[in-house]
């Protein structure tokens, strides 16, 4: 391919990242669990890394993870050798690639290597914890400008009209499919959360009691309903605006 080597590295590095991410996702969904103790001959998924269409047998889990690691290692090498800078957190850079590598190592039971890779992300990515991530009522978990986000989608509002987007299903604030069925946490799981954990304030165990404060934010629609343990996690600044909002795929706290 023509072009500057830095540009080629940037494009090719992202391509290898996406293939690693795709196989990593698929083998966890459709293949056997990776066993850290070895003998990963259980069925994984079909490996197809060439331009072909003929039927192929499923590869073993070990073979799939070998392919995954080859791709993500090459992605890290190429993205580390480019001078190109991403313009949006929906794009891939070296730190996101290292974050995925940390996830892969963790899944393979390689704890120390995973921790070392994650530490590189924490130390070098420039991402920082944001004090109001769990307390703000403006764009909570829906805005990639949050300094904790390493990677996330950034759709245009017109790309997801009406209710065909993640927040249309998950946000209790947007006029959406869950107007009558608010998204909530399992009460026994809620009880396991420490009272000193700031995230516990995202849920409302007595939401159906109008006299219990604070009250959860609900969409301004005729069908709005309340349910105990409902959530105010995916909050948007303008719930009346139709269309998709940003969705986090990788965040700094995951690496800590």
Feature-to-residue mapping (PLM):
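Structured, solvent-exposed acidic/aromatic patches
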Residues: 1-17, 25-253
């Amino acid at each position: 391919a023509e072009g500057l080597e830095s540009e080629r590295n940037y494009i090719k590095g992202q391509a290898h990242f996406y293939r690693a991410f795709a196989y990593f996702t698929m083998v966890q969904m459709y293949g056997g669990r990776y066993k850290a103790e070895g003998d990963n001959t259980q069925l994984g998924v079909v490996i197809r890394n060439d331009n072909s269409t003929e039927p192929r047998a499923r590869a073993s889990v070990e073979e799939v993870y070998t392919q995954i690691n080859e791709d993500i290692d090459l992605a890290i090498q190429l993205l580390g050798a480019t001078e190109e800078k991403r313009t949006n957190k929906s794009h891939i850079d070296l730190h996101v690639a290292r974050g995925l590598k940390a996830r892969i190592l963790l899944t393979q039971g390689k704890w120390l290597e995973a921790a070392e890779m994650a530490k590189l992300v924490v130390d070098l990515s420039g991402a920082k914890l944001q004090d109001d991530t769990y307390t703000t009522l403006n764009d909570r978990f829906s805005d990639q400008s949050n300094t904790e986000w390493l990677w996330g989608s950034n759709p245009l509002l017109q790309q997801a009209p009406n209710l065909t987007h993640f927040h249309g299903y998950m946000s209790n604030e947007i006029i959406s499919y869950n107007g009558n069925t608010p998204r909530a946490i399992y009460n026994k799981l809620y009880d396991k959360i420490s009272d000193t954990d700031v995230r516990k304030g995202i849920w409302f165990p007595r939401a159906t009691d109008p006299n219990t404060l604070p009250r959860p934010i609900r969409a301004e629609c005729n069908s709005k309903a309340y349910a105990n343990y409902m959530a105010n996690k995916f909050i948007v600044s303008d719930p009346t605006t139709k269309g998709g909002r940003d969705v986090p795929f990788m965040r700094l706290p995951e690496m800590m």
